[in-house]
């Protein structure tokens, strides 16, 4: 208060000298009776006469208020350039002597904004529109909107996660801590949320993508009998399952596998032949005889030699030969008939037995 009294004299000195009061053009008295009239009925002379009627109301010395701010340039009107010796504007505006008349209720709402002339010189944080009554703020549309925007941003500085709103005074300190990362476009993002099928959200702070367990993907079975498999190419992760095995033998087992090379087939055939030969080998069971035959008929004929049985008899008249084998009987019968079916191609000689022709062919060689 001592500093305020040293800077601002009492208002009684301002109001007694009406000659020192200066009014801007277009200033209207708050108690003027002609405000209810139409705008066309006003005259410039009425403004001057109505302004000098009420000398008891509080008034401002505009020259004195503007004298402190006239030496300051608009560039130095920011809040961060205040000098510590000069009293702050907040102490000047909230002094009880200054607002004893402004806080009084006014019957008329049509008032002119006095702070419009000081808005260009005063900093935006200390404009008069933030301290005036609602009636004065109604007329100060543009200044109130600008102040409201700045105050609304200051009330919720954490509204934006990327760039918090700070004042000009704290900008240097805040930029030193967090502003270096903003120059490169890096900022802290809130932890994202992952939704699960049970409509619950889990915050992923401290959880990496490797630890998150996702629900299993659905696999689609391929339809083998479908004639257009291209329609299923857009699906993902096909799983081809073999058909169920039935108890009955299928025809697919009889078809040789196409993936096996031909060499493998030949080896299989050779092995199968060896197995068959080993399985069809017939050996003589007579003691001391080790002969083997691939046919059972041949083995029977061999056993007849051991037993002496001769079941085949010659039917030629006067001949009673008997034979143990049928081929022996046929050769014997050709002697009676004189038939020689085997003939040499080189010398045209005929033979009744095939083995005799084979011996003859060796002579020509």
Swiss-Prot record:
Zinc finger (C2H2-type): 282-306, 312-336, 342-364
Tissues with expression: Expressed in cardiomyocytes.
Entry keyword annotation includes Repressor: yes
Induction and repression of expression: In adult heart myocardium upon injury. Repressed in embryos by microRNA miR-144.
Gene Ontology CC entries for this record: chromatin; cytosol; nucleus
Key word DNA-binding present: yes
GO molecular function, one term: RNA polymerase II cis-regulatory region sequence-specific DNA binding
Family under the similarity heading: Belongs to the krueppel C2H2-type zinc-finger protein family.
Protein known as: Kruppel-like factor 1
